Amino acid sequence: MKDYYGKDISTLKNKKLFLFDMDGTINLGNELIPGMEGFFDKLKAAGREYYLLTNNSSRDHQHYVNKMNGLGVPVTRENVLISTDAFTNYMSKNHPDGKFYVLGTPQLEKNIADAGLTMTKTLEEGADFVVVGFDQTLTYEKLTTACRLIDKGVPYVATHPDVRCPIEGGEFIPDTGAMIELIKTATGKSPSMIFGKPFQY
């Protein structure tokens, strides 16, 4: 048996666990990609486990659980992994007392706070790391503070590298990678670490 690209996929029948990206693979925005209807029901019926992954750091797990179930994809909180998980797990283990200035949505900030990490809000408070996430609430003031901290020598990290986020109708909106490029242009510096797919953290 071969796939669309002519590659042998017969070995898939022996796999017990599958990992799937969400945005652009299972769905585009609030629309299921054609051909995905009933696919996960078949996986479950075959006794296979699966996890759904996303680099989108602007939301929390429950958002994706609700969204996927609403699209007919049966999933629980335990089956959803977001790039914020990689970031908070790493920082909780390696920099538990660090201070983080976050470019991100209120939900990303909540996810970070729920992990027990400390955030700062102003230039005067300083930071040990600037965190660049998928910030749909980005303002010039937040961007300026981030760049000034970075210019002062504060390293910055990113929750994921995606430049564009796919949405309904085959369109795209700017994602974290685009914000990284903006900061690189303004400061001349690259992130010290990037989390999320395809990176190892």
For every predicted segment, state its role.
Residues 1-22, 26-201:
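HAD-like aspartate-dependent phosphatase fold
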